[in-house]
Amino acid sequence: MRTAVFGGSFDPPHNGHLALSLFARELAGLDRLIVSVSKNPFKAAADASDDDRSAMARLLVAEINVAGVFAEISGWELQQSGPSYTIDLLRHVEERCPGDELVLLVGEDSYLQMPQWKFASEILKHCTIAVFGRSDIDAADAPPSDPLLPAIHYDFDMPVSATKIRRLAAAGQPIGQFVPSSIAQYIAEHKLYSA
């Protein structure tokens, strides 16, 4: 079975995450997608609570599964007492899904930071890396394929970011074009990202 791991803070999950998941399923021939909500060691703190981010990620998974059940959510990283790194998550998924071929889905922004990740060189022993390019990443910043972190690169142009969504929500602007309706409703009902 080919299982993809898609980790992130999902603060909030948005249409880019949804489209990437569906795109990856078709292009990478995935059988299962594990959406893992995490604490980002490179960010000071999330704007929404762990519970809210998990709830929104569950809504994202429901949206992904409308096209056919293959996604599930994992809260394993949030349950860890200290920082959880990608290598830890991959080892956990290997234990849970023995024999599966693992694919790590990352955006180009994350891929560019990978050399700074803990145990970056170990990651390749556990998975294939699938990188999804973003139009808002300057090509001059993108190194050629890192020989130490080879990856499969996919062109993926979905110009939406969680930062932009949080700013719009804080300013009382509509966000419905950037997030699935279930997530927009959750954000409004729970008054997330309000100033």
Swiss-Prot record:
Molecular function in Gene Ontology: ATP binding; nicotinate-nucleotide adenylyltransferase activity
Enzyme class: transferase
Keywords: ATP-binding, NAD, Nucleotide-binding, Nucleotidyltransferase, Pyridine nucleotide biosynthesis, Transferase
The protein's annotated pathway: Cofactor biosynthesis; NAD(+) biosynthesis; deamido-NAD(+) from nicotinate D-ribonucleotide: step 1/1
Domain of life where this protein originates: Bacteria
GO biological process assignments: NAD biosynthetic process
Statement: the UniProt record of this protein carries the keyword Nucleotide-binding: yes
EC number: 2.7.7.18
Known catalytic reactions: nicotinate beta-D-ribonucleotide + ATP + H(+) = deamido-NAD(+) + diphosphate
Disulfide-bond pairs as recorded: none
Job of this protein: Catalyzes the reversible adenylation of nicotinate mononucleotide (NaMN) to nicotinic acid adenine dinucleotide (NaAD).
HAMAP family: NaMN_adenylyltr
Family stated for the protein in its record: Belongs to the NadD family.
Protein known as: Probable nicotinate-nucleotide adenylyltransferase
